[in-house]
């Protein structure tokens, strides 16, 4: 996992070049948006339990067969595993948001996750629906204008939405 700064330096070093002015401008923008990024991660972290719980409630309301006898989330153990997995995905989305780099999400969370779910008989479409519900809830919390750094957060919103969509597609 590299943060955006390490990645830019590594790429320039590999090419034997100085960091280009366009890369420097992009890094300046990241620094300028650092407070917004930190606020977003803080909000997702502080509301992680409600994000996961509400997404799970929505998923099970939309797909009640999951919690019916014989369903993939039937029994407390399976339900707990489902909630744990949703929480792990959310945690890695916060890491990606904080660093501005999806590699931590892809490499340490999503890599091989679909294959694991297939092997366990977990319906990927249901997991994806839960992840998308978490994404909507997280973005709503992040974009709530009360008590955060003012300014345009649309690019950060799109980035967070992309991380959740990447996670959803990885398990479908």
Swiss-Prot record:
<keyword id="KW-0042">Antenna complex</keyword>
<protein>
    <recommendedName>
        <fullName>C-phycocyanin subunit beta</fullName>
    </recommendedName>
</protein>
<keyword id="KW-0472">Membrane</keyword>
<dbReference type="InterPro" id="IPR006247">
    <property type="entry name" value="Phycocyanin_b"/>
</dbReference>
<feature type="modified residue" description="N4-methylasparagine">
    <location>
        <position position="72"/>
    </location>
</feature>
<comment type="similarity">
    <text>Belongs to the phycobiliprotein family.</text>
</comment>
<feature type="binding site" description="covalent">
    <location>
        <position position="153"/>
    </location>
    <ligand>
        <name>(2R,3E)-phycocyanobilin 2</name>
    </ligand>
</feature>
<feature type="binding site" description="covalent">
    <location>
        <position position="82"/>
    </location>
    <ligand>
        <name>(2R,3E)-phycocyanobilin 1</name>
    </ligand>
</feature>
<dbReference type="Pfam" id="PF00502">
    <property type="entry name" value="Phycobilisome"/>
</dbReference>
<keyword id="KW-0793">Thylakoid</keyword>
<comment type="function">
    <text>Light-harvesting photosynthetic bile pigment-protein from the phycobiliprotein complex (phycobilisome, PBS). Phycocyanin is the major phycobiliprotein in the PBS rod.</text>
</comment>
<dbReference type="InterPro" id="IPR012128">
    <property type="entry name" value="Phycobilisome_asu/bsu"/>
</dbReference>
<keyword id="KW-0602">Photosynthesis</keyword>
<dbReference type="InterPro" id="IPR009050">
    <property type="entry name" value="Globin-like_sf"/>
</dbReference>
<keyword id="KW-0157">Chromophore</keyword>
<keyword id="KW-0488">Methylation</keyword>
<dbReference type="InterPro" id="IPR038719">
    <property type="entry name" value="Phycobilisome_asu/bsu_sf"/>
</dbReference>
<keyword id="KW-0605">Phycobilisome</keyword>
<keyword id="KW-0813">Transport</keyword>
<comment type="subunit">
    <text>Heterodimer of an alpha and a beta subunit, which further assembles into trimers and the trimers into hexamers.</text>
</comment>
<dbReference type="GO" id="GO:0031676">
    <property type="term" value="C:plasma membrane-derived thylakoid membrane"/>
</dbReference>
<dbReference type="GO" id="GO:0030089">
    <property type="term" value="C:phycobilisome"/>
</dbReference>
<dbReference type="GO" id="GO:0015979">
    <property type="term" value="P:photosynthesis"/>
</dbReference>
<keyword id="KW-0089">Bile pigment</keyword>
<keyword id="KW-0249">Electron transport</keyword>
């Amino acid at each position: 996992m590299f943060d955006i700064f390490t990645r830019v330096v590594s790429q320039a070093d590999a090419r034997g070049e100085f960091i280009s002015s366009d890369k420097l401008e992009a890094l300046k923008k990241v620094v300028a948006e650092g407070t917004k990024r930190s606020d977003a991660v803080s909000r997702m972290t502080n509301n992680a339990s409600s994000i996961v719980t509400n997404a799970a409630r929505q998923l099970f309301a939309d797909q009640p067969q999951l919690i019916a006898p014989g369903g993939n989330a039937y029994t407390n153990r399976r339900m707990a595993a489902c909630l744990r997995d949703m929480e792990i995905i959310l945690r890695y989305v916060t890491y990606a948001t904080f660093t501005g780099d999806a590699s931590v999400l892809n490499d340490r969370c999503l890599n091989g996750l679909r294959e694991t779910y297939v092997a366990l008989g977990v319906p990927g479409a249901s997991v994806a629906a839960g992840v998308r519900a978490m994404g909507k809830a997280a973005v709503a919390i992040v974009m709530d204008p009360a008590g955060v750094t003012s300014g345009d957060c649309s690019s950060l919103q799109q980035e967070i939405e992309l991380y959740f969509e990447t996670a959803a597609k990885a398990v479908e």
